[in-house]
């Protein structure tokens, strides 16, 4: 098949029946405004034209989903990552987990995130419970996301489930990095930790990315600490502020050396 033919087939992924209801996992036609799951009756919410295919915890505020303009735009096809370049060039179906405000456009690329950082996302989805069928994708990549997942081992299993036999995965995640990001920073990964997460995959290769100097790490810590103190000072009285600054300073000092 010609490359254009492959791309055309990949571009029609919305009509291939790979989307699943986030509540009951039944086959879900690509949802539009007013769509409902024929099996459980779940109404599919649309946020700025993007379908919300994730479940919610009791009391979770839906307005937290809309984070448009809170992240700078980037284009993952211009980062010089060989895996990403080869996956996009293959014409096969590619899933990006935690796409954020990725400006990359490809007919074979399905971009998801738990929050609406961009209206260019295919859908909002929880990486711990992906709304896709088994064996749906040929390639999966995730850039600077795994440190923000509360159960990365569950996400690794979800990737394994939705990946076709012979498929491939690329995960770029933090090792020596201070607390950062929205809404949470849970884990930094060692080589052995990453291997353990993906120990049910046939082949796992771990490599180190460019080293971040101590000066850069320190600058990041100082900048974050300033923003933390500024936010607390604006939100509380002077007496309360003094108490909270001491606590934040202690916590941040512990994070910096642990």
Where are these regions (language model features)?
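Conserved short hydrophobic interaction patches
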Residues: 139-140, 162, 197
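S-adenosyl-L-methionine-dependent methyltransferase catalytic module, highlighting the catalytic core
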Residues: 153-154, 158, 168-258
